[in-house]
C-alpha cells in the first residue's frame, strides 16, 4: 500500500519517512512558559535533526471539573502562537472545539486538531475540512481503529485530504487506557495510507474513579513510546513540562522537560532502524 505524504510547509509527514515530533505542552499556562518550552524543543530537535511541530491547547474545553484551568482562550492563545512562530519559526498544532473556531484558528496555526471526544461531530468535521488546513484526528478512546476510516471519509467528502490520524489509547474497562499496537496498521489500512502518529502522553492516563483530574504513568513513557516507534509511524506526539508535578493539566503523564533530549535520542534510533528494514510481506 502506498503511503500518503502530508506536507506542512517544508515538513513531510508519512509512515515511511523519518518521524516528525509533535511536541510541546498540554495547555498554554503563560506566554513565558510557552516560550521557554518551545525554545527547548527547537534546540533539541535541531540538534538531533528531527522535524518538529509545537503543540499546545489554548482552551481545554473537556476538563473533568468545572474548576480546572482551561487556558488563556482563543484571542490570547492566538497571540501567543503568533509570537512563537515569529520568534522560533515553528509550525504549530492546536485543537478546536466548535465549528466557529475552525477558521480563525486555521488562519494562525498550521495544523488544526479534532479532539478525541468530538471526532464524530459532523458539523465540526465539515467546518474543519472547509479551512483546507492540515487536520490531526485523535482516535476516540471508545472507537475501534477500523472505525477511523469513516472519519477520514468525512473529511475527504468535505474536500480535505490532508489528514493525519493519532492514537491516544483505548478504554480498557473503567478508568484505564491501553494501546493496541496492531491498531496502528489497521488505521493505516482503512485510511488508505494516511500518516499515523502516536500520542504517548495521553495514552499514559489513568483515573481515580471518584477524582476530578486524570492520573498518569509518567515512569513508563519511554517503554510505551519505544513500542510505538517500533511499528514504523509517521510521528510521535508528546507533552513535556519543566515541573510536571505542578503542571496545570495532565502533569502525571508529562515527560520532564530535561529528559527530552535523551528520550528523543532513543526514539530516533528506533525509527532509523525500523525504517531501514526491507519490506516484508507476511500476508501471503
UniProtKB/Swiss-Prot annotation:
<dbReference type="InterPro" id="IPR013785">
    <property type="entry name" value="Aldolase_TIM"/>
</dbReference>
<protein>
    <recommendedName>
        <fullName>2-dehydro-3-deoxyphosphooctonate aldolase</fullName>
        <ecNumber>2.5.1.55</ecNumber>
    </recommendedName>
</protein>
<keyword id="KW-0448">Lipopolysaccharide biosynthesis</keyword>
<keyword id="KW-0963">Cytoplasm</keyword>
<comment type="pathway">
    <text>Carbohydrate biosynthesis; 3-deoxy-D-manno-octulosonate biosynthesis; 3-deoxy-D-manno-octulosonate from D-ribulose 5-phosphate: step 2/3.</text>
</comment>
<dbReference type="GO" id="GO:0019294">
    <property type="term" value="P:keto-3-deoxy-D-manno-octulosonic acid biosynthetic process"/>
</dbReference>
<dbReference type="InterPro" id="IPR006269">
    <property type="entry name" value="KDO8P_synthase"/>
</dbReference>
<dbReference type="Pfam" id="PF00793">
    <property type="entry name" value="DAHP_synth_1"/>
</dbReference>
<comment type="similarity">
    <text>Belongs to the KdsA family.</text>
</comment>
<dbReference type="InterPro" id="IPR006218">
    <property type="entry name" value="DAHP1/KDSA"/>
</dbReference>
<keyword id="KW-0808">Transferase</keyword>
<dbReference type="GO" id="GO:0005737">
    <property type="term" value="C:cytoplasm"/>
</dbReference>
<comment type="pathway">
    <text>Bacterial outer membrane biogenesis; lipopolysaccharide biosynthesis.</text>
</comment>
<dbReference type="GO" id="GO:0008676">
    <property type="term" value="F:3-deoxy-8-phosphooctulonate synthase activity"/>
</dbReference>
